Amino acid sequence: MSNTATSVLNAFLTEIERLKIKTILDSEINGIKKIENKYQVLVNGKKMLFDKIIISIGSKAGLKENNNYELLNSLGIKMTPILPALCPLVLNGDFFNKWSGIRVEARVSIYENDRFLKSDLGEVQLTDYGISGICVMNLSSLASKALYQKKKVKVHLNFLPNIEKENIDKWLTLRDNTLYQRTVIELLESIIPYKLLYILVSKAGIKSNCHYKSLTWEEKNDLINNLSDLTLEVRDTKEIFKSQVVTGGIPISRVKDTLEDKEYKGLYYTGEILDVDGICGGFNLGFAWLSSIVVSEDIC
């Protein structure tokens, strides 16, 4: 296996040539119009008639400009809002320059108006604007939709995901008794990166040279909250051209099982133009291929 996109492309081109399928490349589609039982497509200013059309125009993800969605306006087809998905989250805070560049294992939970939506576990990349990483991107479409609806979105970061919150005090006390005369930071430095740990301890109002047994209950509680439930408000997602995919598009309720439009016979959709998005790991590419197979089997 060459594992290159060029090899896949060449395989398709070879099969297209074998089947003697006519292709018109490097052409701009200026408009689509329904005329009786056919579709009139304006190609490079020239009108062409087709029995069936497959809309497979991708999305705005990764692109600064993509006006292909306007092609469907002339048919009066409405789409759900096109929003970033599989993208980093921009958070509210004044200390992100201090944690920028840190990678840490954590559980990320997302809340909408203080209502839990979903969580994911993995490596979180801490940045100067907020957070990124696969587990963050897997939750980003939920944040996009909630922010679009003007709802308050928060993330809860758990840097001790393998310990129940109610057991952290007991666990820290045991470490403090076992690792004699260690400061709070020294107790945790082998588990959480020092730079991040210093921020979490400072935010709890604790001096870096303090020992855990000397802390007040309030200080311990604040520290435990920062370690296992650091709560930050999501201000925005990164721009759509920096996202890997989008959420939104043609509603699934608008299409048949064959992905043909319920209103316009002979009009089909494949891939990301449909309001379908998945998590990282090839699911979005897989849907693009599978939807193409479904459509091709129906039109042939």
Regions found by a protein language model. Give the residues of each.
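Glycine-rich loop(s) and the adjacent beta-strand/alpha-helix scaffold that form part
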Residues: K52-F96
